Structure formats: structure tokens, C-alpha cells
């Protein structure tokens, strides 16, 4: 009889009865911030509250759940096993809550308000300087917040809800995402200027000396795209992975320390200005990377991201 009565209660009554022991979004925000920063003071600053407010909110959450989530000492903040599991769940809950608000905002007016986007370092300095003024002109009410980070971190930021979309290069395994491809970006081999007379019109992978190849450090997908385009296993083993940025690699090549691979967008943006470097197209079946905008699968802002992708394509076409 009791079970039958509970089942027949209106759903809104059931929700009201749970409100006394459901964690609040604010409490989950505090917990996630503490996990991210590992320090009560820095977490409080990130949440724009006092340290005592954040600490009290997390204690209230622990009391509510009847479990210790954080072990506190003078020097160390250590999460319990349950605490770590709840942080992962809280990430998803907060992301869903943000998407709920985004859904309403997008229905009212697309590409208005805040949009957080990660851009990988081999795209950001070459595409954004020309793109952002156009975006500001076409969508003056859009408040775009940018993060520059390598592909792995960018995809992690996306799935944790720290950003809404990512501008990156494919192929790259970014998890359960939707993508709008924007354009193909050809790859060129860059040589010191004193080698120009010896170079053919196009360079095949067989003509590249692995000992001379300079690559970006691990974590940059351009390195993988360049090696895949060459399709020579010995290049992966012999290439010197030394550069932290394309600008660093350019300076190394200009000083005769080796050769490297550069994307067309970087060359068009003037990365070789004031150098003696010469470039040649790579003679390969897949001598390009594909620039794309990706977002979480099922995002309520998918239509907005497609509109954003169209703006990016128009900018490239012009």
C-alpha cells in the first residue's frame, strides 16, 4: 500500500520531497573548483567568493551526502575516492545545467552572449588576427572567450565543459563530438635558403633526411599530421622533436639547423617574413590537414556552431 501511494504521488511532489537532500549547483561548482585548483584560496578566487564561503559550501555538501569528499591538512588538499567520483559526475551535471541555459539563449537569438572556444597553437596566431575583426563586425553581440591550448587539452576542456567548441585540425581523436570541416590546409617543407637551388618543384617524402627534420614537441597534432603525410616510419624515429612553436622551428631552420613542415595558413600569415627560408609543396597523397570546428555531440548550440563555421569558411574564401 505504501509503495502504491508513493507511486501515485504527483511528480512535482516527489521533486519537492527531494529538495532537502539534493546537492545544489553552487556546491558542485565549489567542489569542482577545489579539485581543479587544489587550494581553497585559489578555488575561492576562481568562484569569486571568500575562502570561508567556499569551505562552508563544501562542508554542507559533505554533510548532505553523509560522506567525506575532501581530506584537509595544513598543506595538502586530497580528495577521497568517492570525492573524485563525485567531481566527475559534478562536471557532467554542471555542463548539462549550462547547456540548459544555452538552449534558452540560443532560442532567443543565435550567436549572442558568451561563447568559449579553444584554438590550437598551430591555428590561433595565423587565422584569428584576420578572423576576429570579421566576427566582431558580423556578430557584435557575441562575447567570444578564447583559450589557446594543444589538441589533447582542448578536447579535455571541451568534454569537461570548460569550453563550448574547439577549432582544431583533423584527423584527431577528440572523443564523442560533432564536427564542421572548414577547409584543407596544405603542408609545405621548409628549407634553409642556401638549399633552394638544389630543390625540385615538389619534394617527396623519400627526399627528406630524417636527421634534418625538426618537429614540434609531443602534444601538437601538426607533428602527427606531418609524419602521416610523409608516411615514412623512419621519420618518426629519426626526426628531432625540439620546437615548442612553429615560430621557434622557423628560427631554427633559418639558422641552418634543419628543415621542417609548415602549414599553408602560417606561410600566408607571414611566418617566413624577414627570413631566407624557401618552401616546397610536399608530393604526397595526403599533403594537408583539415581545419574543423568541433563541439560536444548533442549540444543544444549545434545550430549556432554551424553558423559560426559558415563565418569561418567565408573568411577563408575571401
Identify the residue ranges that each predicted region occupies.
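Interdomain hinge and pocket-entrance segments immediately C-terminal to HTH DNA-binding domains
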Residues: 6, 24-25, 75, 81, ...
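Short helix-boundary/capping micro-motifs
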Residues: 32-53, 74
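A short LG(V/I)-centered, amphipathic sequence patch enriched
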Residues: 62-84
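Central regulatory/effector-binding core of bacterial HTH transcription factors
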Residues: 112-175, 243
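A late-sequence structural motif
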Residues: 127, 277-318
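Flexible hinge/capping segments at coil-to-helix
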Residues: 174-213
Amino acid at each position: 500500500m505504501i509503495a502504491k501511494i508513493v507511486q501515485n504521488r504527483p511528480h512535482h511532489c516527489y521533486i519537492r520531497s527531494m529538495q532537502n537532500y539534493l546537492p545544489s549547483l553552487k556546491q558542485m561548482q565549489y567542489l569542482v573548483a577545489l579539485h581543479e585548483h587544489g587550494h581553497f584560496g585559489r578555488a575561492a578566487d576562481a568562484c569569486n567568493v571568500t575562502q570561508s564561503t567556499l569551505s562552508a559550501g563544501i562542508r554542507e555538501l559533505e554533510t548532505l551526502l553523509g560522506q567525506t569528499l575532501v581530506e584537509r591538512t595544513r598543506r595538502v588538499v586530497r580528495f577521497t575516492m568517492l570525492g573524485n567520483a563525485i567531481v566527475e559526475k559534478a562536471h557532467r551535471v554542471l555542463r548539462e545545467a549550462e547547456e540548459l541555459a544555452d538552449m534558452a539563449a540560443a532560442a532567443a537569438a543565435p550567436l549572442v552572449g558568451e561563447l568559449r572556444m579553444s584554438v590550437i597553437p598551430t591555428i590561433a596566431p595565423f587565422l584569428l588576427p584576420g578572423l576576429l575583426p570579421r566576427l566582431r563586425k558580423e556578430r557584435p553581440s557575441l562575447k567570444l572567450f578564447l583559450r589557446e591550448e594543444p589538441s589533447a587539452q582542448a578536447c579535455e576542456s571541451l568534454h569537461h565543459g570548460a569550453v563550448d567548441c574547439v577549432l582544431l585540425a583533423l584527423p584527431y581523436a577528440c572523443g564523442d563530438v560533432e564536427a564542421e570541416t572548414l577547409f584543407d590546409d596544405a603542408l609545405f617543407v621548409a628549407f634553409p635558403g642556401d638549399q633552394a637551388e638544389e630543390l625540385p618543384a615538389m619534394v617527396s617524402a623519400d627526399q627528406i633526411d630524417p636527421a634534418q627534420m625538426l618537429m614540434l614537441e609531443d602534444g601538437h597534432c601538426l607533428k602527427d599530421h606531418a609524419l602521416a603525410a610523409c608516411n615514412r616510419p623512419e621519420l618518426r624515429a629519426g626526426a628531432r622533436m625540439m620546437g615548442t612553436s612553429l615560430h621557434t622551428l622557423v628560427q631554427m631552420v633559418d639558422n641552418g639547423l634543419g628543415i621542417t613542415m609548415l602549414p599553408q595558413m602560417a606561410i600566408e600569415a607571414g611566418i617566413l617574413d624577414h627570413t631566407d627560408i624557401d618552401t616546397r609543396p610536399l608530393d604526397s597523397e595526403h599533403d594537408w590537414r583539415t581545419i574543423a570546428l568541433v563541439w560536444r555531440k548533442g549540444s543544444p548550440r549545434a545550430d549556432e556552431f554551424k553558423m559560426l563555421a559558415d563565418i569561418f569558411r567565408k573568411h577563408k574564401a575571401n
